[in-house]
Design a protein with these regions (language model features):
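Extracytoplasmic "Venus flytrap"/periplasmic binding protein-like
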Residues: 61-126, 130-132, 136-139, 154-168, ...
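Conserved N-terminal structural module of periplasmic/extracytoplasmic solute-binding proteins
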Residues: 7, 20-104, 120, 347, ...
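Extracytoplasmic/periplasmic solute-binding protein
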Residues: 136-142, 147, 177-241, 287
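Extracytoplasmic/periplasmic substrate-recognition and gating elements
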Residues: 90, 305-374
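C-terminal capping/gating helix-and-loop segments adjacent to ligand/active sites or protein-protein/ligand interfaces
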Residues: 332, 372-375, 381, 396-452
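Hinge/lid segment of periplasmic solute-binding proteins
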Residues: 29-34, 99-157, 195-200, 313-320, ...
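Short helix-initiation/N-cap motifs at beta->coil->alpha
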Residues: 74-83, 174-178, 270-284
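Glycine-centered hinge/linker elements that transmit conformational signals in sensory
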Residues: 183-184, 233-272
């Protein structure tokens, strides 16, 4: 089939400009125009499990206030594409769904409503935060995120005071080699640190779980680093990628992964058991380092969770990869783009657009997005009391201001993302838990990419046909 031009218009540097634009618009108020919720139904298929509770509450409040039926279904980790395909085949299909990358924009082209002339688009502070395909704005980002290695400032500052510490301040931890030296040393001195400072430390790094609830941190977010640096070398679009990869930086991936595993109290043989909770380990002060993103800020600082860490304890550093550590910033981007189902009845389209506009303009919606979900939102309505309170997002901006280069979310290019990641996780599990060969990880990463790319980019017509057939058969 003839390929159409696809672009996810996003650059790593836009985080700073987006946040700066929002800050300068401090006096911007939410729209005061008369609100019309419409007469249709809203069905949001949510991509982010960690936002489910807040979205369910919003849906209930909106339904009570406006009499509009709002349903929120949250897909399980790693199952979004499967769930989306299944739900889209039903007569009551989602009216709002997530388009995460170029492949998704192509696959669901017939289902994406052009958002260019909507209030949602008009409120977007950075018009590059869209997925554009086939001459239309197919989807709009609902948040902008950064991830790296979360660290406990208080415990690290205690460690820096110890004799023979491998670093004396955070400024010293500016490369993979130094990070590994510090992590190795902390892991070997856990009891000494606890005795000296009264901490409850058990490990340097929180567990690197390979079950579905955690493995995406490594098959997606850690895997982003070798993809990013290879795409950069090859001079291709950093978020659109290329049909084949060489795995140039997989040895760097291995070095970081081995550090995560060896400098943790978790048993490597049981990492896929689902028995570990890395957030809890870090939140209770049992770990110094935890690879995750700014979406964790809300959970870690929520008093209801009973964690010992406080907001002032938290910092985030880049995932130093041993390639360009001196210039590397956090990994910044998004894969969370709202799309509207163009095949839904017009009244449902109108009500779905009204609901999203309410989320980004109402007090209830903005509070939920910022306070309950901990998101940094790219709309001009998120100012004043609704400006992001996420300290991790501020770290991303500070690093950019210091001249560091944010790492683009190159994993947005991943073809058939769930299938590719599953194969990588299986190989990574065999290597880590069963003494398998690292070559199998390379094969899953490199050969698996080419295979899934072929399926994704040449099989779009069959995917769409299958969905249409399922719909007609219902």
């Amino acid at each position: 089939m003839k390929k159409k031009a696809v672009s996810i218009l996003m650059t790593a540097a836009m985080a700073a400009s987006m946040l700066a634009t929002t800050a300068m618009a401090g006096e911007t108020e939410a729209s005061t125009e008369a609100f019309d919720p419409g007469t249709g139904k809203v069905y949001l298929l949510n991509f982010k499990p960690e936002t489910d509770e807040a979205l369910q509450t919003l849906a209930s409040d909106y339904s009570s206030q406006y009499g509009v039926d709002v349903t929120v279904l949250t897909a399980a980790d790693g199952q979004y594409n499967t769930t989306l395909t299944s739900e889209m085949a039903k007569s009551d299909a989602p009216t709002i769904f997530t388009v995460g990358n170029a492949t998704a924009a192509q696959t669901w082209n017939d289902y994406t409503y052009d958002l260019k002339d909507t209030p949602l688009y008009s409120h977007l502070t950075d018009k590059s935060l869209t997925v554009n395909y086939d001459g239309k704005v197919a989807a709009i980002a609902n948040c902008f995120e950064s991830y790296g290695i979360i660290y406990n400032k208080t415990i690290l500052n205690d460690y820096f005071q110890m004799d023979n510490a491998k670093a004396k301040s955070m400024d010293d931890i500016n490369s993979f080699d130094t990070l590994k030296a510090v992590a190795d040393d902390i892991q070997s001195r856990v009891d000494e640190i606890n005795d000296k400072f009264g901490t409850s430390l058990t490990e340097a790094f929180a567990s690197a779980g390979l079950d579905d609830s955690s493995s995406w941190r490594f098959s997606g977010h850690l895997a982003n680093l070798p993809l990013y640096y290879e795409f950069k070398d090859d001079g291709v679009d950093l978020t659109a990628g290329e049909p084949t990869i060489k795995g140039t930086y997989l040895d760097n991936f291995k070095n970081v992964w081995d550090m995560y595993v060896s400098d943790s109290a978790a048993d490597p043989k049981t990492l896929n058991s689902g028995s570990y909770n890395a957030e809890q380990e870090f939140g209770m002060g049992e770990a110094v380092f935890y690879q995750n993103g700014d979406w964790e800020f809300s959970a870690l600082t929520n008093e209801d969770n009973g964690y010992e860490v406080k907001a002032e304890d938290l910092g985030m550093m880049p995932i130093y990869f041993g390639v360009d550590d001196a210039n590397e910033g956090l990994c910044s981007g998004t894969e969370n783009f709202w799309a509207i189902n163009a095949k839904a009845p017009q009244e449902d389209i109108d009500s779905s657009l009204a609901f999203l506009n309410w989320v980004i303009t109402s007090d209830e919606g903005r509070k939920a997005m910022v306070d309950d979900m901990g998101l940094t939102c790219p709309f001009d309505t998120f100012t004043g009391d609704y400006a992001s309170k996420n300290a991790f997002g501020a770290e991303a901006t500070a690093l950019q201001s210091a001249g560091k280069t944010s790492v683009a979310w190159s994993f947005n290019a991943t073809p058939n993302v769930d299938d590719w990641r599953k194969d990588v996780v299986n190989a990574l599990t065999d290597y880590t838990s069963n003494g398998g060969s690292w070559d199998a990880v390379k094969t899953a990463f490199v050969d698996g990419w080419a295979h899934q790319w072929t399926l994704a980019h040449e099989g779009e017509a069959s995917t769409e046909a299958a969905t249409e057939a399922a719909t007609e058969a219902e």
